[in-house]
């Protein structure tokens, strides 16, 4: 899977971006994501994600992660975008690095654990997972923890 990482403000280290990419690659393998496929991950400030949240979701507040799934587009929108030899476009993840740092401190675990959590959480949304019912939440939580545990990113390991 091709991952396009955008960190124009240099909010993360190279190793942190590589960790996110490794987490997403591992999750894609576990989920059987078709190849070739592509997604982008953009790292923003709280002010920037606040603007994205207001413009695209109608919510006037910053948030931690937003997923924009290409598969949620209508058939007409998809027809002109996809050729057979083009990668399957999964979508875009937008992560607030500031909110990530705040939440890591609030939850008492490492920044890397929270960053990994936000990445896998958003990625699973791109694949159609949700947490609207207790059953959906349990399934999504189990998948998230499976991936994070693989990378030894457990709760409380500051």
Curated annotation (Swiss-Prot):
GO terms for molecular function: metalloendopeptidase activity; RNA endonuclease activity; zinc ion binding. It is an enzyme of class 3 (hydrolase). One of its GO terms (cellular component) is cytoplasm. InterPro entries: MetalPrtase_cat_dom_sf_prd, YbeY, YbeY_CS. One of its GO terms (biological process) is rRNA processing. Its main location: cytoplasm. It is found in: Cytoplasm. Single strand-specific metallo-endoribonuclease involved in late-stage 70S ribosome quality control and in maturation of the 3' terminus of the 16S rRNA. This is Endoribonuclease YbeY. It comes from Exiguobacterium sp. (strain ATCC BAA-1283 / AT1b).
């Amino acid at each position: 899977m091709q991952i396009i990482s955008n960190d124009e403000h240099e909010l993360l280290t190279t190793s942190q971006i590589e960790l996110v990419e490794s987490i997403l690659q591992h999750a894609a393998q576990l989920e059987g994501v078709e190849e070739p496929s592509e997604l982008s991950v953009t790292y923003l400030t709280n002010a920037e994600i606040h603007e994205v949240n207001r413009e695209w979701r109608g919510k006037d507040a910053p948030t931690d992660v937003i997923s924009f799934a290409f598969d949620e587009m209508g058939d007409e929108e998809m027809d002109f975008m996809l050729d057979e030899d083009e990668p399957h476009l999964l979508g875009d993840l937008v992560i607030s690095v500031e909110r990530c740092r705040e939440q890591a401190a609030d939850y008492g675990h490492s920044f890397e654990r929270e960053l990994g959590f936000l990445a896998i959480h958003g990625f699973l949304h791109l694949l159609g997972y949700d947490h609207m019912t207790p059953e959906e939440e349990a399934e999504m939580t189990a998948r998230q923890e499976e991936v994070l545990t693989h990378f030894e990113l457990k709760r409380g390991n500051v």
